[in-house]
Amino acid sequence: MYEYFEGTITVVNPAYVVIEVAGIGYRILTPTPYAYKEGDKARIYVEQVVRENGMTLYGFKSQQDKVLFNKLNEVSGIGPKSALAIMAAEDNGALASAIESGEVSYLTRFPGIGKKTASQIVLDLRGKMGNYVAENLFTEDEPVESVFPALEDALLALGALGYSQKEVDRIKPKLKKLPEMSADEYIKQGLGFLLKK
């Protein structure tokens, strides 16, 4: 069983990345492929799912994201692909908070999640997200190598424009999902997100 891969990102695709470790390329499905950049060194925490038709690797930027994926995957009616789609749609801190507070309507916003499945998620996982919410484990505090330098500059600039750290942290996961761009473009996108309150 693999715990994580550490190597060089060689392919970034809308659905997956390829990480090369000791001359072998591993294709890993991830909710945030554009958080990685070709040529970057990275550590990806992986979950191996074996089915009759083969083996699939699912990868995450942190151990906590991997734990959340496994919890979602254990819910009746949620498979690995649905769990991945849920984690790609919003930041995981907000997701954990919604589960803890029983916000079924929030959960139905995710692809393929109806009211029945959303209720099942709350039923199965409510009371198990407290540590994630309380300790704020999903703040995307990952190594700098996984974040575009221009994005870091843009986040600092937004803070200098008068936005609070909380506001900047709220939009950071959304900006990280975008393809790499200039700091000016990140600032424009960030302002757009901030004004959509």
From Swiss-Prot:
| Region of interest (Domain II), ranges | 62-140
Q: Which UniProt keywords apply?
A: Cytoplasm, DNA damage, DNA recombination, DNA repair, DNA-binding
Q: Which residues form a coiled coil?
A: none
Pfam families, per this entry?
HHH_5, RuvA_C, RuvA_N
Q: Name one GO cellular component term.
A: cytoplasm
Which SMART domains does the record cross-reference, listed alphabetically? HhH1
Q: Which GO terms describe its biological process?
A: DNA recombination; DNA repair
Q: Which family does it belong to?
A: Belongs to the RuvA family.
Q: What is this protein called?
A: Holliday junction branch migration complex subunit RuvA
Supply the source organism for this entry: Lactobacillus delbrueckii subsp. bulgaricus (strain ATCC BAA-365 / Lb-18)
